[in-house]
């Protein structure tokens, strides 16, 4: 039973006899030959399927593994076009595989365009994901169409030379895809284990060197058959398959799958252990000091600022006095253990499910030919590995909300998202508090005045996003005398969870890179004296304080936090 027989309905007529495993004479309109033999793991064509025939039925006596066929017209549910007879089975398989290939191409293109069109997604980690998408896209566009054509026609129709090139590109793309998954696992472990040092450890130059090495290794693995490390070439050019030479099968399986799989499993286990330990430490810190243990504070020390007697913001400066204001951002912690376990199970489980059967059967069948699976089973296993390239765009990028939003913008033909300055964000949510007897005023300026003390916070507790009623109640409450104005950058959450370290390192990197941009400074730049980022250590009282140049923060955007 072939791959086509599994996915479609059989339309074959009575079979004729054959002494060599090939087909019988194709004289009758409803007579078809049985399946031919297989060379190199590729099955012979099925009678009544896609075959070449130009003479009469009696003239179309086939050689071993080559079915006979009528020259034109219809044969038992088959359609003849230009000398090729394509069965209804082949049409069904072709439609299924075409949808499969288009899905893989579209998904990987979305990943690449999302990063290319959104500057805030252009990070080192996402560069590795883009490399994975490039490998999968190359596989989907340059390899799978020819594999699908061979499944539909039942034979290889592109010649011996192109068969060798196709097989090499197949191994190249699959190996690069698997090694990209391995690189992503190492990158995520480094990002979680050494979050504050991550920008210095994983620079763009190092990432480029890693990707170059990755493709070099994939190239070395793939060129073996082109240099002669393969089985004897079959005489019939209509057969094309992967090389099953024992030495190369073991070498390619170890380098392309078993070593990367070991690294992936170890790295993701370490990620889970570190995330679990960090989550427990942060939860313990919150119990000891509620509201402080998980808080990361970006402080901007400004010159004197005052609030007018009516409660409206003022910009009066006072000599010898410095009013310290802060942008207090309650960033997200690591995922809870259950969510982390679920995500890692999906990542590792799908990878192993897709590739392990193929890389188990390939060396086993090379060493022990009597243990090789049937044609139909091997074809399913073969395409299951290709399926991993189709689901990769769903597993990795779609686990990020930013990627999901970028996908939606691309589907709506909105390539770029307008990025507003941090100081112009959510102006309608701010409030001023004074000691005046009157209620606090809440105008809606789009840009905060120079020297104004700002606070960006996310408060834990029940509830969802702010509503007009809750905003009115907050603005009408009496407060002690202060000059605090608050922007709610993040909505209230049930728990302040997920990815504390990654957010801190990203924010730190954005602040550092601000000084290298040649953009106009924001309105507060002239009033700022110092910028610092305070990060509490896990489960400890000490705080790590990182100072920055006053001008470095000027290009900090809403999307950076």
Curated annotation (Swiss-Prot):
Glycosylation positions in this chain: 60, 76
Cytoplasmic side: 116-127, 187-207, 270-342, 400-561
Record's comment on post-translational modification: Palmitoylated. Palmitoylation by ZDHHC21 may increase the expression of the receptor and regulate downstream signaling.
Bias (Polar residues): 467-479
Entry-linked SMART domains: 7TM_GPCR_Srsx
GO cellular component, one term: plasma membrane
InterPro entries listed in its UniProt record: ADR_fam, ADRA1D_rcpt, GPCR_Rhodpsn, GPCR_Rhodpsn_7TM
Main location: membrane
Extracellular-side positions: 1-90, 154-163, 233-245, 368-374
GO BP: adenylate cyclase-activating adrenergic receptor signaling pathway; cell-cell signaling; negative regulation of the force of heart contraction involved in baroreceptor response to increased systemic arterial blood pressure; neuron-glial cell signaling; norepinephrine-epinephrine vasoconstriction involved in regulation of systemic arterial blood pressure; phospholipase C-activating G protein-coupled receptor signaling pathway; positive regulation of cytosolic calcium ion concentration; positive regulation of MAPK cascade
Transmembrane feature ranges: 91-115, 128-153, 164-186, 208-232, 246-269, 343-367, 375-399
Keywords linked to the UniProt accession: Cell membrane, G-protein coupled receptor, Glycoprotein, Lipoprotein, Membrane, Palmitate, Receptor, Transducer, Transmembrane, Transmembrane helix
Lipidation residue positions, type S-palmitoyl cysteine: 413
UniProt feature, compositional bias: Gly residues: 21-56
Subcellular location: Cell membrane
Pfam families: 7tm_1 (PF00001)
Any GO MF annotation of the entry: identical protein binding
Tissue specificity annotation: Vas deferens, hippocampus, cerebral cortex, aorta, brain stem, heart and spleen.
Annotated spans, Disordered: 10-71, 452-481
Topology within the bilayer: Multi-pass membrane protein
Organism superkingdom: Eukaryota
Description of how the protein assembles with itself and partners: Interacts with FLNA (via filamin repeat 21); increases PKA-mediated phosphorylation of FLNA.
Biological role: This alpha-adrenergic receptor mediates its effect through the influx of extracellular calcium.
Record family assignment: Belongs to the G-protein coupled receptor 1 family. Adrenergic receptor subfamily. ADRA1D sub-subfamily.
The protein's name in its UniProt record: Alpha-1D adrenergic receptor
Species, as recorded: Rattus norvegicus (Rat)
Gene symbol of the encoding locus: Adra1d
């Amino acid at each position: 039973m072939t791959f086509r027989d599994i996915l479609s309905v059989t339309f074959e007529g009575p079979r004729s006899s054959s002494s060599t495993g090939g087909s019988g004479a194709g004289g009758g309109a409803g007579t078809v030959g049985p399946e031919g033999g297989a060379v190199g793991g590729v099955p012979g064509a099925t009678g009544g399927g896609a075959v070449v025939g130009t003479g009469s039925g009696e003239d179309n006596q086939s050689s071993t593994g080559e079915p006979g066929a009528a020259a034109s017209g219809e044969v038992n549910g088959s359609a003849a076009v230009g000398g090729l007879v394509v069965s209804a089975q082949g049409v069904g398989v072709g439609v299924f595989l075409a949808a499969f290939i288009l899905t893989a191409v579209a998904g990987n293109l979305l990943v690449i365009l999302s990063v290319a069109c959104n500057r805030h997604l252009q990070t080192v980690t996402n560069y590795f994901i883009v490399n994975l998408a490039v490998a999968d896209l190359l596989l989907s566009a340059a390899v799978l169409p020819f594999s699908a054509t061979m499944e539909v026609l039942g034979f290889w129709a592109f010649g011996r030379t192109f068969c060798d090139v196709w097989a090499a590109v197949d191994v190249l793309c699959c190996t690069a895809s698997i090694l990209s998954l391995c690189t992503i696992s190492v990158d995520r472990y480094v990002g979680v284990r050494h979050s504050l040092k991550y920008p210095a450890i994983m620079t763009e130059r190092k990432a480029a060197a890693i990707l170059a090495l990755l493709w070099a290794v994939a190239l070395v693995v793939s060129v073996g058959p082109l240099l002669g490390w393969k089985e004897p070439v079959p005489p019939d050019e209509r057969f094309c398959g992967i090389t099953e030479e024992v030495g190369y099968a073991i070498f390619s399986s170890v380098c392309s799958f078993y070593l990367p799989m070991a690294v992936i499993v170890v790295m993701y286990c370490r990620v889970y252990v570190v995330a679990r330990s960090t989550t427990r430490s942060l939860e313990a810190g919150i119990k000891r000091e509620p509201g402080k243990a998980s808080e990361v504070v970006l402080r901007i020390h400004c010159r004197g600022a005052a609030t007018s007697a009516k409660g409206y913001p003022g910009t009066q400066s006072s000599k010898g006095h410095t009013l310290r204001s802060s942008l207090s951002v309650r960033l997200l912690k690591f995922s809870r253990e259950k969510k982390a376990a679920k995500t890692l199970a999906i990542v590792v489980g799908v990878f192993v499910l897709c590739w392990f059967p193929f890389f188990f059967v390939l060396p086993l069948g090379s060493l022990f030919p009597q243990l090789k699976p049937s044609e139909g089973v091997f074809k399913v296993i073969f395409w299951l590995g290709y399926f991993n390239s189709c689901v990769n765009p769903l597993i990795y990028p779609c686990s990020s909300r930013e990627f999901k939003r970028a996908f939606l913008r691309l589907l709506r033909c909105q390539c770029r998202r307008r990025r507003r300055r941090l100081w112009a964000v959510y102006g309608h949510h701010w409030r001023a508090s004074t000691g005046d007897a009157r209620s606090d005023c809440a105008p809606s300026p789009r840009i905060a005045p120079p020297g104004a003390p700002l606070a960006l916070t996310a408060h834990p507790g029940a509830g969802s996003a702010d509503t007009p009623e809750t905003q009115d109640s907050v603005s009408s409450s009496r407060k002690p005398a202060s000059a605090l104005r608050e922007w709610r950058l993040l909505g209230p959450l049930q728990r302040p969870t997920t990815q504390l370290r990654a957010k801190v390192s990203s924010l730190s990197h954005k602040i550092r890179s601000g000084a290298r941009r040649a953009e106009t400074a924001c309105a507060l730049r002239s009033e700022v004296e110092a910028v610092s980022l305070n990060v509490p250590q896990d489960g400890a009282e000490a705080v790590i304080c990182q100072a920055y140049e006053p001008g470095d923060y000027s290009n900090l955007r809403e999307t950076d936090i």
